[in-house]
Amino acid sequence: MRVAGLFIYPVKSLRGCAVPAATVDALGFAGDRRFLVVDDAGKFLTQRTHARMALVDTRLAGDSLTLSADGAGAVTVSTKPDAAAPLRTVSIWKHEGLLAEDCGPAAAEWLSAFLGQSVHLVRIGPKFHRPVLKKAAHPGDLFAFNDGSPVLVVSEASLDALNDRIQENGGEPVPMNRFRPNLVLTGCAAFAEDAAPVLRLGDVVLRNAGKSDRCIVTTTDQLTGERLGKEPLRTLATFRRDPADPSSVYFGANFINESKSGTIRVGDAVDAHPA
């Protein structure tokens, strides 16, 4: 089993980028989901309700993050924490009262114009503290603006198995980017990521925190921002439900980085171990 791909998404729900190597830090993959778009009340926005977010490119260069979109120009902000930046109180899922740094009026105006409502861009600073709430979490396990865990793992074999079923039902195969993974595996059986208690990648250890439940974002074309019908959720519902939670469907696995430092590279060997 090896690493087939590595991806980071600098701003939650905006476009991500493939990287040849990912550095692990206290919150997961460095640079991943360290920024968040929020409304005036501090509530987070995602593609679930704002599919146009899929049209915004993100580019990291040095200490800068640039957002751009066709016909909308671009805006650049710093990735470095700023003690002088005003703080915003933000909420994401079960976490409320999180303190994040406001990235300033230029980013807010650019995103507000693009999304058609008043929004703000915030970034993680030294006052940010968000513990992982999964049962597998240990004291001190933290994460950024991810949904459920610091690292989302999917295997190529799992996607192939899903697409085989979709095509058997007359549908079109879906690409990996619909699932917005961080780590893509190759050389393993379908859904092997679900069953691996621990993944070891050189000096980096990842701990399994359970299967990832999927939402309407998986039906959104990540290049055009269009909703494209009911797949893959319709097919996932036929074979990827949990009897204990029949309202959800699952694809990919949530992992917590037990290691708070280290580097993972495309092509690295991956070993599955018992807990």
Model-derived features: positions:
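Metal-cofactor-dependent catalytic cores
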Residues: 1-275
